[in-house]
């Protein structure tokens, strides 16, 4: 899994540093990035999932969505469009560079992220997430 891959890559990097040999470091760094991002995004996705979930946000998050997107419905429409176009993930992130919430597409775990952004919500739209229950109807999964 992602954690094992991440840990193995970290061990390789540590051994390379100690030995002063860096031939395998580039691959290990890619594995840290891929497995680390895969683990973090899946962890956030599972935290977002709840049998009681699905309601509109309240409080500061709701206020910020209204400020940055105009309304919850506008945010939701844009988020669903991002998820429909994504090869891997749609994320609601806080972009600290522009000080606003954004919907972003991340086609692979480690590609498409916006530097300085902090993920708030993640939707896994890889086929393994929906195909068993929804078949090819990815849009139905996104709307659920």
UniProtKB/Swiss-Prot annotation:
- Catalyzed chemical reaction(s): 2 superoxide + 2 H(+) = H2O2 + O2
Briefly state the protein's biological role.
Answer: Destroys superoxide anion radicals which are normally produced within the cells and which are toxic to biological systems.
Q: Which organism is it from?
A: Haloferax mediterranei
Q: Which SUPFAM superfamilies match?
A: Fe,Mn superoxide dismutase (SOD), C-terminal domain, Fe,Mn superoxide dismutase (SOD), N-terminal domain
Q: Which residues bind Mn(2+)?
A: 42, 124, 128
Would you identify the family this protein belongs to, as annotated?
Answer: Belongs to the iron/manganese superoxide dismutase family.
Please share the entry's free-text remark on the cofactor. Binds 1 Mn(2+) ion per subunit.
Q: Which Pfam families match?
A: Sod_Fe_C, Sod_Fe_N
**Essential cofactor(s):** Mn(2+)
Q: Which GO terms describe its molecular function?
A: metal ion binding; superoxide dismutase activity
The source's domain of life comes to Archaea
- Keywords on record: Manganese, Metal-binding, Oxidoreductase
Question: Metal-binding among the record's keywords?
Answer: yes
| E.C. number | 1.15.1.1
Stated name of the protein: Superoxide dismutase [Mn] 1
